[in-house]
């Protein structure tokens, strides 16, 4: 399916270079996955720094800026995310959204527990609760990519998404 629009000569060249569809798919999405890991790591580091400074209230209140940053990031890696979200069936990434959310939920649970223990957060969240909220959140964020919306429209929708997901209220900052 990935090579559908190519002529036979190009298909042969593709399959010579890659051991199969899975290897080709992996090569196409690898830069996106690496960029995601870098972004997640940087965001996590920033959040813990703000937690240590007791600045989570201002971070949570300024949610629109990082949300637009995430949306911009998705569009910088648009092709990779389209593959992961719309064309990964039959690959090890067929459950990308669920796997991404599960990892994010584990990280968020540790963060939420730390914030609660330090009395920065007044709400003790449970793991399944975080998982459900993050599933909804990331599903909404990925929707513009899945539906091929223009970047400008997706950035515009960030205002509504930010209102819907009031992290300050969810975490009790």
Identify what each model region corresponds to.
Residues 16, 23-47, 61, 65-69, ...:
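Alpha-helical structural segments
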Residues 61, 69-76, 90-117, 128-135:
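Amphipathic alpha-helical packing segments from all-alpha helical-bundle domains
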Residues 35-46, 80, 136-144:
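Solvent-exposed, amphipathic alpha-helical segments
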Residues 50-56, 84-91, 120-122:
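Short linear capping/connector segments at secondary-structure termini
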Residues 84-101, 156-169:
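C-terminal/domain-terminus segments
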Residues 76, 106-114, 130-173:
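C-terminal peripheral helix-coil segments that are non-catalytic and often amphipathic
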Residues 1-10:
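Single conserved hydrophobic/aromatic residue that forms the stacking wall/gate
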Residues 10-18:
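Short hydrophobic/aromatic patch on the recognition helix
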């Amino acid at each position: 399916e990935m090579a559908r629009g190519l002529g036979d000569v190009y298909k042969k060249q593709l399959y010579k270079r890659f051991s199969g569809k899975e290897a080709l798919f992996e090569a196409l999405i690898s830069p996106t996955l690496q960029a995601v890991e870098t972004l997640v790591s940087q965001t996590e580091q920033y959040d813990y720094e703000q937690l240590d400074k007791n600045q989570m209230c201002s971070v949570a209140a300024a949610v629109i800026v990082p949300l637009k940053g995430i949306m911009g990031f998705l569009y910088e890696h648009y092709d990779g995310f389209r593959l992961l979200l719309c064309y990964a069936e039959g690959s090890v990434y067929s459950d990308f959204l669920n796997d991404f959310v599960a990892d994010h939920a584990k990280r968020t649970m540790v963060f939420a527990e730390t914030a609660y223990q330090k009395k920065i957060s007044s709400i003790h969240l449970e793991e399944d609760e975080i998982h459900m909220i993050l599933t909804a959140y990331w599903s909404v964020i990925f929707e513009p990519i899945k539906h091929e919306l223009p970047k400008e429209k997706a950035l515009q929708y960030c205002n509504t998404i930010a209102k819907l997901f009031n992290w300050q209220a969810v975490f009790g900052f």
